[in-house]
């Protein structure tokens, strides 16, 4: 009889470690449950530019008739959050698809999967770009398998508060300047932006405001960006995530919604404040459980950003330079300033 061949203690430990690493990379914990939300394997890289593959595993591309139209955020193995204005009523649900695990939109990768859309739920209060209720839920036609490139982000609970000055990250494949598309192979772009209080944001949007086109920062909106401009979001990535870190966990603090031109001074990006829709989310998707956000950082007063900023002016803007209101957003990542120089 042939002798039985077994593993020694050291070999068993090594195999166990390898199995655990494999489970973590596949998005499954050792107990067989799904990956926890808001966790990333790639280390965080601050600033702006091209992201690393798998750095923002909840980022999705929403396509219509095969063309990228919006971003979105994976929040479970069946649901994606995006902006309501990405889904005009005249558009057919069957023409939408969701691309997950993508890094370069123009390059094929085994890590990328495409799902059709089974259901689209938009908030009933949404009316037009710039109005409240700019949030939508998309149910995938079949559950997605988590991996190191496909993982969910955490939804914040209703009482969640993200402090002014907190550096968050907006991501997407949008234009790099007004009417200037991201060049092939269109790698995912990232931009770190500080949060701005609603009061200061309203103050900034009243600078050089056009009376016929008022800017209203609603209670369900969140602002982030730079007062001097040059780094912002632009056309093409509405619906994408504004991801904010709290104690090592990433939360979907905002959804790219609207803005006044791309990278213009005194015009930070405006996002749908996800936490204000926690009860609406639970009503429509009971299986999703928003997560309590730890309050470990105090908000920094930021009124000086408006009242004493050198760009401040009470004069009306020249008509030829007047920006377009309520523009769907995507990332400029500072390239806007270079584009303007030419």
UniProtKB/Swiss-Prot annotation:
Domain Peptidase S1, chain residue ranges per copy: 45-286
Record's GO cellular component terms: external side of plasma membrane; extracellular region; membrane raft
Ranges annotated as spanning the membrane: 320-340
EC identifiers of the protein: 3.4.21.-
Membrane topology: Single-pass membrane protein
Propeptide: 30-32, 323-342
Active site: 85 (charge relay system), 134 (charge relay system), 238 (charge relay system)
Top EC class, one word: hydrolase
Carbohydrate-modified residues: 110, 159
A GO molecular-function annotation: serine-type endopeptidase activity
Keywords: Cell membrane, Disulfide bond, Glycoprotein, Hydrolase, Membrane, Protease, Secreted, Serine protease, Signal, Transmembrane, Transmembrane helix, Zymogen
Subcellular locations according to the entry: Cell membrane
GO biological process, one term: transepithelial transport
Disulfide bridge positions per record: 37-154, 70-86, 168-244, 201-223, 234-262
Listed Pfam families: Trypsin (PF00089)
Signal peptide (from-to): 1-29
Keyword Glycoprotein: yes
Keyword Hydrolase recorded: yes
Function statement: Possesses a trypsin-like cleavage specificity with a preference for poly-basic substrates. Stimulates epithelial sodium channel (ENaC) activity through activating cleavage of the gamma subunits (SCNN1G).
Assembly and binders: Heterodimer of two chains, light and heavy, held by a disulfide bond.
Family to which the UniProt record says this protein belongs: Belongs to the peptidase S1 family.
Name used for this protein in its record: Prostasin
Source organism: Mus musculus (Mouse)
């Amino acid at each position: 009889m042939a002798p039985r061949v077994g593993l020694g203690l050291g070999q068993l430990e090594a195999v166990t470690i390898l199995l655990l690493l494999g489970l973590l990379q596949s998005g499954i914990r050792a107990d067989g449950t799904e990956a926890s939300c808001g966790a990333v394997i790639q280390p965080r890289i601050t600033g702006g530019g091209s992201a690393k593959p798998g750095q923002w595993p909840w980022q999705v591309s929403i396509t219509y008739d095969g063309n990228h139209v919006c971003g979105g955020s994976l929040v479970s193995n069946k649901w994606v959050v995006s902006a309501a204005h990405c889904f005009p009523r005249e558009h057919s649900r069957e023409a939408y698809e969701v691309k997950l695990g993508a890094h370069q939109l123009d390059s094929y990768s085994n890590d990328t999967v495409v799902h059709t859309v089974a259901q689209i739920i938009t908030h009933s209060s949404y009316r037009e770009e710039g109005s409240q209720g700019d949030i939508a839920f998309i149910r995938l036609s079949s559950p997605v398998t988590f991996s190191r490139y496909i993982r969910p982000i955490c939804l914040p609970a209703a009482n969640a508060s993200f402090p002014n000055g907190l550096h968050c990250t907006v991501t997407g494949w949008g234009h790099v300047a007004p009417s200037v598309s991201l060049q092939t192979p269109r790698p995912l772009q990232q931009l770190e932006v500080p949060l701005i209080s609603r009061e200061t944001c309203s103050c900034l949007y009243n600078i050089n405001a056009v009376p016929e086109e008022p800017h209203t920062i609603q209670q369900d909106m969140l602002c982030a960006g730079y007062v001097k401009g040059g780094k912002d979001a632009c056309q093409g990535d509405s619906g994408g995530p504004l991801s904010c870190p709290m104690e090592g966990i990433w939360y979907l603090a905002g959804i790219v919604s609207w803005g006044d031109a791309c990278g213009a001074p005194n015009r930070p990006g405006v996002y749908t404040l996800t936490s204000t829709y926690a009860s609406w989310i639970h009503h429509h998707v009971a299986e999703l459980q928003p997560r309590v956000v730890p309050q470990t950082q105090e908000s920094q007063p930021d009124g000086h950003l408006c009242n004493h900023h050198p760009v401040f002016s009470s004069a009306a803007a020249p008509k030829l330079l007047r920006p377009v209101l309520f523009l769907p957003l995507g990332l400029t990542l500072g390239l806007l300033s270079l584009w303007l120089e030419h």
